[in-house]
Amino acid sequence: METLLLNDSKKIDDIKLIFESNEININLKNLIHIEDISSKTTGIIILRELKPSYLKPFVDYSIKKNIKVLAVGRALISLINTLKGTNEKVYRSFSGDRSTFISLGSRLAEIIGGAGPLKTNYLNSYEIPIENMPNNFLPSSINLNNGCIEAIELEGKGNIMGIIWPIFSSNKMPSRFEN
């Protein structure tokens, strides 16, 4: 099994260290061309904004072959534009707060082990209004203050998820759920 980091050779060593420090065995490789995807590929990580025309073949191939895709941070903007077939500005300046809501029954809730309201450990500089949600996607998490998207996932078949949180930074996302 291998996981591919899409066109981000500058960060690959940092990402490998994060996995290693958490005792997660990962075969992480840099991906530049669609031809670089092998039959052993199980996931693709996207960490930065990319042009929708560049990203689209990777997303389409991933859906066809059921390869997991995770778009992190500003890569979520690229993912949304790719899925909507546009290059428009889908974000605005951040007006929310550190409160978020993880949707019950979402894949995100399965991954982190719970759903409901929680506090994140950061304030972002941008937000994505809910009206920019691509077709066939569900909000996995929304900001409780402003209702903006913090995470999305493909409904039904497929394993595509995008999250606004900087999970590969030292500033981690939710530490606990609120009661």
Where are these regions (language model features)?
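N-terminal beta1-alpha1 cap of cysteine-dependent amidohydrolase-like domains
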Residues: 1-74, 84, 93-105, 109-115, ...
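Acidic/charged, solvent-exposed loop-and-adjacent secondary-structure segments enriched in E/D, K/R, S/T
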Residues: 88-89
